[in-house]
UniProtKB/Swiss-Prot annotation:
The record marks 178 as: Activates thiol group during catalysis. This is Glyceraldehyde-3-phosphate dehydrogenase. InterPro entries: GlycerAld/Erythrose_P_DH, GlycerAld_3-P_DH_AS, GlycerAld_3-P_DH_cat, GlycerAld_3-P_DH_NAD(P)-bd, Glyceraldehyde-3-P_DH_1, NAD(P)-bd_dom_sf. Its EC number is 1.2.1.12. The keyword Protein biosynthesis does not apply. Belongs to the glyceraldehyde-3-phosphate dehydrogenase family. One of its GO terms (cellular component) is cytosol. GO terms for molecular function: glyceraldehyde-3-phosphate dehydrogenase (NAD+) (phosphorylating) activity; NAD binding; NADP binding. Homotetramer. It comes from Sordaria macrospora. It comes from the Eukaryota. The lineage of its organism: Eukaryota, Fungi, Dikarya, Ascomycota, Pezizomycotina. Signal peptide: none annotated.
Amino acid sequence: MVVKVGINGFGRIGRIVFRNAIEHDDIQIVAVNDPFIEPKYAEYMLRYDSTHGNFKGTIAVEGSDLVVNGKKVKFYTERDPSAIPWSETGADYIVESTGVFTTTEKASAHLKGGAKKVIISAPSADAPMYVMGVNNESYDGSANVISNASCTTNCLAPLAKVIHDNFTIVEGLMTTVHSYTATQKTVDGPSSKDWRGGRTAAQNIIPSSTGAAKAVGKVIPDLNGKLTGMSMRVPTANVSVVDLTVRIEKGASYDEIKEVVKKASEGPLAGILAYTEDEVVSSDMNGNPASSIFDAKAGISLNKNFVKLVSWYDNEWGYSRRVLDLISYVAKVDASKA
């Protein structure tokens, strides 16, 4: 089944979700809303991308709408989500990627315009969070607003699940070495709530907070309170890497751990958790659609119960692909209950 999807917010994730949708057989983007971008500029921003290259296809503007690969995509410029007429295009599922409407109440405004479900492309304080390959099967169709969690949680959770299912995680700490994002500064500037975050992104390694590790406890309840973490923002434009250090109950050699992760990447988590023994660096992962790419040669163990694991992720491309995979999955569940 092909799911008709609308995107609210044509920023970094909104555009990368759109690009991914071109490669996704189950998804058709039928409408986009962004009050700060006019259609001609939206065409330009979709066509050219400094990180992921030029758009592979045709894009044009027809009136106030986009035409992508010969198909019309309605373009709206509404500030109020409740005023977007999603029903005009049959957009049943909405990607909420503004970064503004991240609560159930705020994101529910899309339902007034005819949307059936809203998927927030960010963590949410109160909407149920789902991570593909981890807890998506717990979705029962009852929630109209859900969250795809964060890019870091999508990298960490599948790996943590495999380790916990096989060796039982006692406790752990995570550091994500994370590329800079749009919220950071090009030069030193005011940032009253996060002084370090106000320093220039391209010149500094900047320690920062992240809720990604604690959020794993929401999608894997058994790990609630057992993981926490932090972030180091670094001067790279894209691709990040999780460093997960855990104490495990069932002792195992590093080779045994590698084998378990490799097996999972070829089985139930194929396409979500990937595995490599190549001598890779961050740029090699640019455009990788997996949520988490386990780097077998980068990890180390101190003993059979204490291990450091390393997993890469394209925090833009891989995450955006999961947003669409989640939509495809929930649409099938919803259809089965109709």
